[in-house]
Amino acid sequence: MTVILYLCTGLYLCFVLFIIAGLFKHNTNAVKTNNELSKVSIVVAARNEENNIASLIHDLLHQTYPRDKLEIIIANDRSTDQTGAILNEAAAKHSYIHHIQIEECNPEMASKKHALQQAIQRATGDIILCTDADCQVPQTWVSSMASSVKSNGGITIGFSKIAGESFFDQYQMIDFLSITAANAGFGGWKVFWSGSGQNLSYEKKNFDLINGFT
């Protein structure tokens, strides 16, 4: 029993050291700025997000990325609140915001994936940039993610954090940070195991190559 305990402890320590070493490897992979800017399509799936979607739209409208190289496509996934009205108003004011109304489910696909698939199919950008309707993003979000995609083989997994000051929010933040750190550690060795859809970008041609979420 003691031998098994030592063996498990040794394996766990090797696992932790592997992650830590991977985190430091990211320092050598600086993002290179590309002077030739690609068109970026931001895609969002929203369902009953009347309390959050306006804040996200505000952030997206204040990006440093050139507006003529940007489009925002938001798929309203059968919302029963005022999400649709908010999206209609935003699309009427800003020509590069597009509102897609999802009326039916796809029995072979999760509802969010179906909504995202519909949005991506309408995208005209070379780069797809994903976030969630209840997220907030900094002004340099599009610029940094788009540059990173071109420097990292066509896909970039961004960092996200959970906001809030309650005990539950803080607990979630620590739990999510540990998962993200482990994934980033493996990523330093070029073996990412997952990517959160709330901060993810990739080249559209790669999405088309694998036939999307089907």
Where do the model's predicted regions map?
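Cell-envelope/extracellular polymer assembly enzymes that use nucleotide-activated donors
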Residues: 38-41, 71
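Acidic donor-binding segment of Leloir-type glycosyltransferases
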Residues: 57-105
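N-terminal membrane-anchoring/stem segments of glycan-assembly enzymes
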Residues: 1-36
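Short, well-formed alpha-helical segments that are part of the catalytic scaffolds
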Residues: 22-31, 49-63
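Long helical/loop segments within the catalytic core of UDP-sugar-dependent glycosyltransferases
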Residues: 15, 96-119, 144-214
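Active-site nucleotide-sugar/metal-binding loop of Leloir-type enzymes
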Residues: 91, 114-127
